[in-house]
Amino acid sequence: MKGMILFISCLLLIDIVVGGKEGYLMDHEGCKLSCFIRPSGYCGRECTLKKGSSGYCAWPACYCYGLPNWVKVWDRATNKCGKK
């Protein structure tokens, strides 16, 4: 039983460490990175360029998984898009 608990704990820890964060990529103005008129696969490429594991076009913006902590993702609370 103790072994099973230890095994499950290790799996959860691996998911936390390896999983990374997820969210919408931001452009240089702090807005979500648009994929509205981009070709298929654009968001996946952009996400992997940022060292993410994968990504897709969550119309109309790129959403990424497995991003490292240094990558800034869009957050409603700190949204600066269109504001000066």
Curated annotation (Swiss-Prot):
Which residues are connected by disulfide bridges in this protein? 31-81, 35-57, 43-62, 47-64
Record-linked PROSITE patterns: LCN_CSAB (PS51863)
Q: Give Gene Ontology CC terms.
A: extracellular region
Where, by tissue, is this protein expressed?
Answer: Expressed by the venom gland.
Where would one find the signal peptide in this protein? 1-19
Q: Which residues form the LCN-type CS-alpha/beta domain?
A: 21-82
Which Gene3D superfamilies does the UniProt record give? Knottin, scorpion toxin-like
One GO BP annotation is: biological process involved in interaction with host
InterPro entries, per database record: LCN-type_CS_alpha_beta_dom, Scorpion_toxin-like, Scorpion_toxin-like_sf, Scorpion_toxinL, Scorpion_toxinL/defensin
- Indicate where the modification Cysteine amide is found in the sequence: 81
Q: Which UniProt keywords apply?
A: Amidation, Disulfide bond, Ion channel impairing toxin, Neurotoxin, Secreted, Signal, Toxin, Voltage-gated sodium channel impairing toxin
The molecular function GO annotations come to: sodium channel inhibitor activity; toxin activity
Localization per record:
Secreted
Q: What does this protein do?
A: Beta toxins bind voltage-independently at site-4 of sodium channels (Nav) and shift the voltage of activation toward more negative potentials thereby affecting sodium channel activation and promoting spontaneous and repetitive firing. This toxin is active only on mammals. Is toxic to mice.
User: What's said on domains?
Assistant: Has the structural arrangement of an alpha-helix connected to antiparallel beta-sheets by disulfide bonds (CS-alpha/beta).
Family, according to the entry, reads as follows:
Belongs to the long (4 C-C) scorpion toxin superfamily. Sodium channel inhibitor family. Beta subfamily.
Output this protein's name. Toxin Tst1
From which organism does this entry originate?
Tityus stigmurus (Brazilian scorpion)
**What is this organism's lineage?**
Eukaryota, Metazoa, Ecdysozoa, Arthropoda, Chelicerata
